[in-house]
UniProtKB/Swiss-Prot annotation:
Keywords: Cytoplasm, Disulfide bond, FAD, Flavoprotein, NAD, Oxidoreductase, Redox-active center. This is Dihydrolipoyl dehydrogenase. NAD(+) binds at G182, S183, G184, I185, I186, D205, A270, I271, G272, R273. FAD binds at E36, R37, Y38, D39, K40, L41, G42, G43, V44, C45, K54, A117, D313, A321. NCBIfam families: lipoamide_DH (TIGR01350). It comes from Buchnera aphidicola subsp. Acyrthosiphon pisum (strain APS) (Acyrthosiphon pisum symbiotic bacterium). PANTHER family: DIHYDROLIPOYL DEHYDROGENASE (PTHR22912:SF160), DISULFIDE OXIDOREDUCTASE (PTHR22912).
Length: 473
């Protein structure tokens, strides 16, 4: 039986972008329906992405720190890795958050329908699951269906030892020899996790750099610190993956030199993600897709059909949960009649590796490309009392200032908890702060966050925690 549902707003997808949009719509008094293909809210991020990866990265960090404590006089035995318990702990964390979302949905009186959605017209869509079929008529729709991993056509993905990020986070096993293809954020984070859990990890990338948006002085610090964790090979691509009963046999080309018959127990393909829009029936309603495969939207997240919105990964890069959350808020507010726009000055990015890498605004090389008259101010963490005391002095805080007005235009941090520090830099850029604003803001001592204030002091020529090279200028 085809049931008919009527609503003011239908949101397709319950990841961070989708549930944020639905919750905001409900808070603004709009009758809201949420459609989710799976049995739990939260999308990739909460269920098989951001949250489980951070749970495992925390475990990896503790393992590494415990190992390094021997130099202080505290030694531990080799850790006993119980994969079943780790998986249960990871799922406990996921369940706690998804259950919280479910509770908030109920309290907001948002109706939810599980199943696959496809547009029938620009005012209706069909939702089907194994038991039911619904037709939902709406005034406004928000598409928030997220993204999926990109596959390499020449690799036999039907073999259970060829993984994507979801497989890697399910902890199927801890492979003795593990190959990761792709040195983006996902690849580097998975390398961090599995090397800590005992795998011998090779990570390869066909390009001559990893995380290409960051500056070389930031990436070089990271590269030096991972030498004992895993093997990073750039300028390397896969030639062939042969499936055998006991192993995956890989041939690769490293810096134009063939490397043949390398045995791996598992291979993770982490070369990026693509918008999850193929099965929505967008062609039926004439929804425009841009040249990069994303749904085309304006700064109010409207598509070319004004009452249909797109947010999150389907609406363009950067494909980050926090960007999608803010887009969800804007879309809901526009639907409710508010004249709001999605126009952030900057969006932060973080690689939750060990050490972490975080950046926001312009990098130095981007400032060069834009012909900006800029100046770099760096505070090295080997001059930070807190970093030295915490055994994390490998790192630096780097700020970029426009020399014409001394305003901050970008920042990068590599080091422990860099992701927790970068927010101050983002706020400073959004607020239009200049170096003096940051330098005269009293930061607590000893903290890692004071490295931001001290970097501004380097620019100002007032720093006393390192040599002041501006004294005679």
């Amino acid at each position: 039986m085809n049931k008919k549902i009527y609503t003011q707003v239908v949101v397709i997808g319950s990841g961070p972008a989708g549930y944020s949009a639905a919750f905001r719509c409900a808070d603004l008094g709009l009758d809201t329906v949420l459609i989710e293909r799976y049995d739990k809210l939260g999308g990739v991020c909460l269920n098989v992405g951001c949250i489980p990866s951070k749970t495992l990265l925390h475990i990896a960090k503790v393992i590494k720190e415990a190992k390094e404590l021997h130099k202080t006089g505290v030694s531990f035995n080799k850790p006993d890795i119980d994969i079943k318990k780790i998986k249960n702990w990871k799922q406990h964390i996921v369940n706690k958050l998804t259950d919280g979302l479910s509770s908030m949905r109920k309290k907001r009186k948002i109706r939810i329908f599980q199943g696959h959605a496809i547009f029938e017209t620009d005012k209706s869509l069909c939702v089907t699951n194994t038991e039911d079929k619904f037709t939902i008529f709406f005034d406004n729709a928000i598409i928030a269906t997220g993204s999926k991993p990109i596959k390499i056509p020449s690799i036999p993905h039907d073999d259970i030892r060829i993984w994507d990020s979801t497989d890697a986070l399910s902890l199927k096993k801890i492979p003795n020899n593990f190959l990761i293809i792709g040195s983006g954020i996902i690849g580097l984070e998975m390398a961090t996790i599995y090397s800590a859990l005992g795998s011998k990890v090779d990570i390869i990338d066909r390009f001559n750099h990893f995380l290409p948006v960051i500056d070389e002085d930031i990436s070089s610090i990271y590269k030096k610190s991972i030498n004992q964790q895993f093997n990073l090979m750039l300028n390397t691509h896969i030639d062939k993956v042969e499936v055998k009963k006991d192993a995956l046999i890989v041939d690769m080309i490293h810096e134009n030199i063939p490397k043949k018959n390398i045995l791996y127990d598992a291979v993770l393909v982490a070369i990026g993600r693509t918008p999850n829009i193929d099965s929505l029936g967008l062609d039926r309603i004439g929804l425009k897709i841009n040249n990069f495969g994303f749904i085309q939207v304006n700064n109010q997240l409207k598509t070319n059909i004004p009452h249909i919105y797109a947010i999150g990964d389907v609406a363009g890069t950067p494909m980050l949960a926090h960007k999608g959350v803010h887009e969800g808020h804007i879309a809901a507010e526009v639907i409710s009649g508010k004249n709001h726009y999605f126009e952030p000055k900057v969006i932060p990015s973080i690689a939750y590796t060990d050490p972490e890498i975080a950046w926001v605004g312009l990098s130095e090389k981007e400032a060069k490309q834009e012909n900006i008259n800029y100046e770099v101010a760096i505070f090295p963490w080997n001059a930070s009392g807190r970093a030295i005391a915490s055994n994390c002095s490998i790192g630096k805080t780097k700020l970029i200032f426009n020399k014409q007005n001394n305003k901050i235009i970008g920042g990068s941090i590599v080091g422990s908890n860099a992701g927790e520090l970068i927010g101050e830099v983002g706020l400073a850029i959004e607020m239009g702060c200049d170096a003096e604003d940051i330098a005269l803001t009293i930061h607590a001592h000893p903290t890692l966050s004071e490295s931001i204030g001290l970097s501004a002091e380097v620019f100002q020529g007032t720093v006393t925690d390192v040599l002041n090279f501006k004294l005679n200028k």
